[in-house]
Amino acid sequence: MISIKNVNKYYGKIQVLKDVSIEIESGEIFGIIGHSGAGKSTLLRCINGLEEYQEGSVLVSDKEVKSLNEKQMRDLRKELGMIFQHFSLLERKTVFDNVALPLECFGYSKAEIKKRVLELLEVVGISEKKNDKPRNLSGGQKQRVAIARALALNPQVLLCDEATSALDPNTTKSILSLLEDINKKLGITIIVVTHQMEVIKQICGRVAIMENGEVLEVGDTEEIFLRNTKGLRKLIGEESIILPKGTNIKILFPKDISNEAIITTMARELNIDVSIIFGKLEQFKDDILGSLIINISDKSGEQVKQYLTSKGIRWEEMINE
C-alpha cells in the first residue's frame, strides 16, 4: 500500500528526515510516534504530497508521489483523507456543509452530496448535529466532523496528525474507538502520528519510533512494549538497568499468560532462590502484558532456561549494555 524507502528531506541545510524506510500494509492501523521535532508530521506530509522530499522514494498504491503531475496529485489526494489536531473546520458553515465541502470541490451532484454526507454523519455518530455550527460543538464532536469530511471521497488511507492531542482522555478513547471501528468496517488503512503512548497502545497494530528525523525501530506494537525495546526505552527516557552478577533472564509475559504465577511456581518446583530485579506491566488495549528480569545463580541458569522453555514461556538472557 505505502512503501517509504531511504527518504531524506532538507529545509535548506537542515536535514529533517534521515534515510527513513517504512512499509505500511493495506488495511492496517500503523502508528508513528516520537517527540516534537522527530519528523513524524513531516513524513506524513511527504506521503500526501504536501511536503517535497529530496531523496528516496514514497510509493502510494505503486505511484511515486514526487513524480506526479498536478492532475495525478489531485487524484492521489482523493485516496488520502487527513485529520488534524485542531480540526480545521469552517466556522461559518454548518456540520453538513463542512462534510460536503470536498464533494462540492470534486463536482458531485446535490443529491449525491446529501446522500453521502448523511451516511457519514451516521457513521461518526453526530447525525443530530448536521445543522449546527462548529462553535456549538465539543472538541470530540468537532473531530468527528473532521473524520466524516476526511472520509467523504472514499479514501483508501486516513492520515491522522496528532488527531487526539487537543482532547481530554475520555474523548480521546471515544475517537480512537471510532477510528478502530472505521478501520474494521471500511477496511481503510489508518496512519496515526502521535506523541501519546496510550494512543499507540490502544489501536495500532504496528508502530515506528522516530527521533531526530530517524526511525529507531519498526515493529509489532505489542512486541515492542512486551520486550521494552531499546528504541522504546530511548523514547520514554528510561535508563538501561545495571545487572548484578549471576545469570539474568528476562521473562516475557504476553497477554495470555500475564496472570499466571510463573516465578513462584518455578522457584518452588526447582528449589532455587530467585531475585526479581526489574518488572514492568503495561495496560495494552484490554489486557495486561509485561516482563520481569530475574537474577539467579550461574549454576541454576541452565536449569531455569530449560524449565521456562518446557513451559512454553518466552525468555532471553540479559547482559549489561
UniProtKB/Swiss-Prot annotation:
Q: Which UniProt keywords apply?
A: Amino-acid transport, ATP-binding, Cell membrane, Membrane, Nucleotide-binding, Translocase, Transport
Q: ABC transporter domain spans which residues? A: 2-237
Under the heading SUPFAM superfamilies, the entry gives: ACT-like (SSF55021), P-loop containing nucleoside triphosphate hydrolases (SSF52540)
Its cellular-component GO annotations read: plasma membrane
InterPro entries assigned to the protein according to its UniProt record, in alphabetical order: AAA+_ATPase, ABC_transporter-like_ATP-bd, ABC_transporter-like_CS, ACT-like_dom_sf, MetN_ABC, MetN_ABC_transporter-like, NIL_domain, P-loop_NTPase
UniProt catalytic activity: L-methionine(out) + ATP + H2O = L-methionine(in) + ADP + phosphate + H(+); D-methionine(out) + ATP + H2O = D-methionine(in) + ADP + phosphate + H(+)
- What Pfam families does the database record attribute to this sequence? ABC_tran (PF00005), NIL (PF09383)
Its Enzyme Commission number(s) read: 7.4.2.11
How is it placed in the membrane, per its record? Answer: Peripheral membrane protein
| Residues that hold ATP according to the record | 34-41
Annotated compartments: Cell membrane
GO MF, one example: ATP binding
Task: Say yes or no: keyword NADP present.
Answer: no
Q: What does this protein do?
A: Part of the ABC transporter complex MetNIQ involved in methionine import. Responsible for energy coupling to the transport system.
Similarity field: Belongs to the ABC transporter superfamily. Methionine importer (TC 3.A.1.24) family.
Subunit description:
The complex is composed of two ATP-binding proteins (MetN), two transmembrane proteins (MetI) and a solute-binding protein (MetQ).
PANTHER family cross-referenced by the UniProt entry: AMINO ACID IMPORT ATP-BINDING PROTEIN (PTHR43166), METHIONINE IMPORT ATP-BINDING PROTEIN METN (PTHR43166:SF30)
Q: What is this protein called?
A: Methionine import ATP-binding protein MetN
